[in-house]
Amino acid sequence: MTKFRGCIDIHSGQVKQIVGGTLTQDDTTELNHKSTTTENFVSTKPSSYYAELYKNAGINGCHVIKLGSNPENDEAAKLACQSWPNNLQVGGGINGDNALEWLDVHKASHVILTSWLFSDSDEGKEFDWVKLKRVSELVGKSRLIVDLSCRELRVDDKIEWVVAMNKWQTLTNNKLSAEFLGEVSQYCDEFLIHAADVEGLCNGIDVNLVAKLGEWCPEGFEGKIVYAGGARSVKDLDTVSKLSDDKVDLTYGSALDVFGGKLVKFDDLVSWNELH
């Protein structure tokens, strides 16, 4: 059954909502005050506030994403996990060296891996199956989420979704498909998929991608694919439910009132989950 999932995006140590396509620089201390990233919302509240908000509302499976290598992002993510230990999924800069620390020390429920899973090849960035298998064995399949966020590519009137890494700026050689998702699913517990072209714009979800994710959903992964990007109405949950045959979950960002948005009320999403 489709459900609402929560997110906590962290940039420069603060909870923010940004336009995904503008995240072209690493978030370092030096760039804090001259970033080119377009911000929709910058919270005055700590990450722990949002962790407790989701906890008290019973919104499970929420993710915390560190947008850049700024050490302040690590501290904010740790604070969120301390507020709801063993319940939040953490991504952004996670690799084979620090994954266990986030799980066992900082008490994330899952780690979300993206860019580290890709290696250089003669043709560009290629999904590294050796790395995937290694980290899956290290942390356990049940604690690993693979982020396969993507950008839309049109070739001869055919729509394809190419997996994007490096803050969604670098296109890889891998495209989303039933076969690809099926193979990756053998080593992880969930997928997180941002539609990078519509992320943060509040102009509507990528309905074609949502439908395909429902079609391509591996057996046993119903309710384990989280789509993010463009949600602007509570009715988007109904749309995702219908298009994906209840196999895909939906997260909201810039449209949500708790992130300064004016289109969607958090309480309405909580009620939707309770009713369904």
UniProtKB/Swiss-Prot annotation:
Name this polypeptide is given: 1-(5-phosphoribosyl)-5-[(5-phosphoribosylamino)methylideneamino] imidazole-4-carboxamide isomerase
Primary location group: cytoplasm
GO terms classed as biological process: L-histidine biosynthetic process; L-tryptophan biosynthetic process
Keyword annotations: Amino-acid biosynthesis, Cytoplasm, Histidine biosynthesis, Isomerase
Entries under Gene3D superfamilies matching the protein: Aldolase class I
Species the sequence originates in: Debaryomyces hansenii (strain ATCC 36239 / CBS 767 / BCRC 21394 / JCM 1990 / NBRC 0083 / IGC 2968) (Yeast)
Functional pathway: Amino-acid biosynthesis; L-histidine biosynthesis; L-histidine from 5-phospho-alpha-D-ribose 1-diphosphate: step 4/9
Assigned EC number: 5.3.1.16
Major enzyme class: isomerase
Similarity comment: Belongs to the HisA/HisF family.
Subcellular location: Cytoplasm
Any coiled-coil regions, as ranges: none
GO cellular component, one term: cytoplasm
UniProt xrefs under InterPro entries: Aldolase_TIM, His6-like_euk, His_biosynth, Isoase_HisA-like, RibuloseP-bd_barrel
Keyword Cytoplasm assigned: yes
